[in-house]
Amino acid sequence: MIKTGINGFGRFGLHLLKYWLDHKDKANFEISYINDDFLSIKEVLNIINSDSYVVFNNYKISLADNQLVIVGNDGLEQRIEYTNKPKLEIPWIGKPDIFLECSGKNTSKKDCDIYLIGNTKKVLISATSWDAKNIIFGFNHQDLNENDKIISYGSCTVNAYVPLANYLHKKYGIVESDANFIHNIPNYKLKDFNTLHRKFCTLEKSGPNLLTFINENNFTVNYTVVPYDGVSMLDFRFKLKKNVSYQELIDDLQYAFSQGELAYLYDFQESDKGPEVHKFTTYSAVFIKPNTRTINGNLYLHGYFDNENSVNRYFDLANYVSTEKIINPLPKKFD
């Protein structure tokens, strides 16, 4: 089994641990190490046992020296070595096959080069990187090769938009598009400005970098953060080149989401039950079918995404990277 280690146990690291435990039967990798430069092991245990959003109620978690001991309902025990060290002093650097950089502090190749020693062959960054290759699961993950040592999974908004936009462009052609997000944010990140706040969104830059058919002249992102801890909301607009009926669009999307190239990435719901029912969804976005509209060649899609739980696509990418052909490629033959 491929070994991984997490650096950074904030919201993303917490969600990743829970998602991995809940989907361990599908995982090609083990989480063997966790480091955080701020939190002690006792503080981490307290967070795991008391967080009101990410609930580990199917697991009994305790401490044994410098290890988190996790026992599931099946009685199986998992031990994870925990360290509370600055980045340059992490004692297990070079031991895992894959380094999961989840601190949000190290988002460039230069920041992550230190991890590529010993057994470590790949580094996966849990945030947008502007110089590492962005690998979006369900869009370009099959382009990953042995030379891609340090990669980013994108972001929650990038994963929600890019595979869908790519599909729509291939099928109908996209003339222009905009993406609108109401995105949750912890209160402390807004400091004294504790209300709605418009911000820059990574999709504004990453979208055109990944998709050749959008640019600053035909693509706009409106990104508003709001201080609460629930599921976030999105609205997409696509002006299509091809003249297509509403029903044809609905049928094509339904097929793509259920059994086509977007299966497992997106879902179509028959009614709008509000955002909170989509807490911990495995989908990058869930769209509401009755709220889907077409007006003058524009397709409007409304839905929800659990941005904190975009670890679902990070998990998928780590799982893909953990396959033998990626982590241990066959040596090239020479004549």
Give the location of each predicted region.
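N-terminal Rossmann-like NAD(P) cofactor-binding subdomain of oxidoreductases
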Residues: 1-189, 305, 323-334
